[in-house]
């Protein structure tokens, strides 16, 4: 059984997080998050073994292989899975936009998406959501 740690994702010293409503979900619920580390963090990942891997998995595998990261950008409402070349372009753009807002390298950003399969990301909402999420970063998450 997993032990719940008080303080959530920012319980460890030096981590900030935010969750915002970017408008991806029609319900109006929180649908984007950014998590950052003040210093370069050791990074690893566990990914699907399925032959069909969503674009964020492809992007994040490269980050995990390098073993170092400073941020994670997450969206819900759209999985960016089974979206072909456009999906890869969009997942890379999510990493690039997050890196740009944080002043770090694109290769230091994990990308994670969950939601409806077969639909491309609404990149206008993603881009503005990343800006909002970075502005809202806080040590109390």
Where are these regions (language model features)?
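Alpha/propeptide regions of enzymes that mature by internal proteolysis
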Residues: 1-141
């Amino acid at each position: 059984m997993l032990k719940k740690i008080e303080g959530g994702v920012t319980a460890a010293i030096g981590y900030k997080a935010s969750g915002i409503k970017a408008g991806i979900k029609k319900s109006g619920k929180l649908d984007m998050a950014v998590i950052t580390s003040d210093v370069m963090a050791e990074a690893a990942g566990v990914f699907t073994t399925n032959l069909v891997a969503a674009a964020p998995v492809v992007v994040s595998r490269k980050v995990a292989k390098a073993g170092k990261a400073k941020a994670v950008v997450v969206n819900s409402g759209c999985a960016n899975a089974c979206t072909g070349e456009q999906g890869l372009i969009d997942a890379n753009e999510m990493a690039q936009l997050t890196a740009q807002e944080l002043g770090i390298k694109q290769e230091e950003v994990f990308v994670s998406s969950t939601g409806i399969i077969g639909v491309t990301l609404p990149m206008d909402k993603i881009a503005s959501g990343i800006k909002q999420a970075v502005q809202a970063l806080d040590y109390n998450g």
